[in-house]
Regions:
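N-proximal, solvent-exposed amphipathic alpha-helical segments enriched in charged/polar residues
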Residues: 1-6
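A generic structural signal for short beta-strands and their flanking turns/coil linkers
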Residues: 9-11, 20-22, 67-73, 84, ...
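Hydrophobic residues in beta-strands and at strand termini
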Residues: 26-28, 77, 124
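Catalytic strand-loop segment that frames the active site of acyl-thioester-processing enzymes
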Residues: 11-40
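Compact, glycine-rich, soluble single-domain proteins
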Residues: 38-51, 55
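HotDog/MaoC-like acyl-thioester-processing domains
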Residues: 81-83, 87-130
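Hydrophobic beta-strand-centered segment that forms part of the acyl-chain substrate-binding groove
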Residues: 55-87, 92
């Protein structure tokens, strides 16, 4: 699915399926550093990683023919993103016929210490009625 989104390829997003979940990984890359003194990941890279993780999660689990369209994205930065691999998991809170709400958590050391959390709302292809 990464080939469908050039930005995903640019920042290096990887995805692994773990049963009914997807684990997204953003490998440490010097190209993704925003503050070279710390060094710390650029906040926009973290946001883009989380938004794409949510969109790809929906793409996989809804079987939609195309990438869902973002309606709204709200992100809370909780800790600095260090220069190391970053991981994310998504949870669909609600999915209707036209809109889906997704929660995203990103971490580096352990899921118990997230570096950011986000909520995303997507317009999805209207699902056929039974």
């Amino acid at each position: 699915k990464r080939q469908l989104v050039p930005y995903a390829r640019l920042i290096g997003i990887e995805c692994t399926r773990l049963g009914d979940e997807l684990l997204f990984r953003l490998p440490a890359s010097k190209d993704n550093i925003g503050n070279p003194i710390l060094p710390a990941l650029h906040g926009g890279v973290i946001a883009g990683f989380m938004e794409l993780a949510a969109a790809l999660h929906l793409l996989v689990f809804t079987g939609a023919p195309g990438l869902p369209k973002i309606i709204d994205f709200s992100l809370d930065y909780l800790r600095a993103g260090q220069f190391r691999d970053t991981y994310a998991k998504c949870q669909v809170w609600r999915q209707g016929r036209r809109v889906a709400n997704v929660a995203i958590t990103a971490w580096q050391s352990t899921p118990a210490e997230p570096i950011a959390t986000a909520r995303a709302h997507f317009k999805i292809e209207e699902l056929a009625r039974p």
